[in-house]
Amino acid sequence: IVYDEDRIAVISQDKKLFLYNHGETTDGVKEIGQGVEGIHFSNDGKKIAFWSRNEIAVYFARKWETQPSREEGQKIDIVRFSQPIKNVSWFKDYEHLIFSAGDKIKIVELDNRSIKNINDLVDLNLDDFKATYNNREDNLFFINKNNENKKLYSISLTEENEE
């Protein structure tokens, strides 16, 4: 997966994640994960979310100066579940991740300074579904993959303003 000419990520056949990173303090190829199922760059390319069957981590390809600050090359373990993790997406602020574990869609913050905040967004009561988050519209879309009459569902995550 190519973010730009200075940041390129590759998942090998044996599920190792390699990152070519030409940054301020790093230059070259480095293995940053094992058992990796997928990855997403943040919109600015400074962060890379990657996940295995049961864990999500974030690697900082560039220095992050917003609190809490992180250094280039820093890796943070975000969550670990006994259930398989799927449907990982960045939330619109790129300081939270949306993912599914079991039949629940959850949101977790990246801030690891204290107790990790993880919340359930929705309990779908479905065995097998595909979900994705659209940050432009602030909608969560999902489809039941086991249903013959597949339907696309949408949930708005935008807070309504009280007037």
Question: What is each of the regions a protein language model found here?
Answer:
Residues R80-L110:
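Loop/turn-rich, solvent-exposed surfaces of beta-rich toroidal or solenoidal domains
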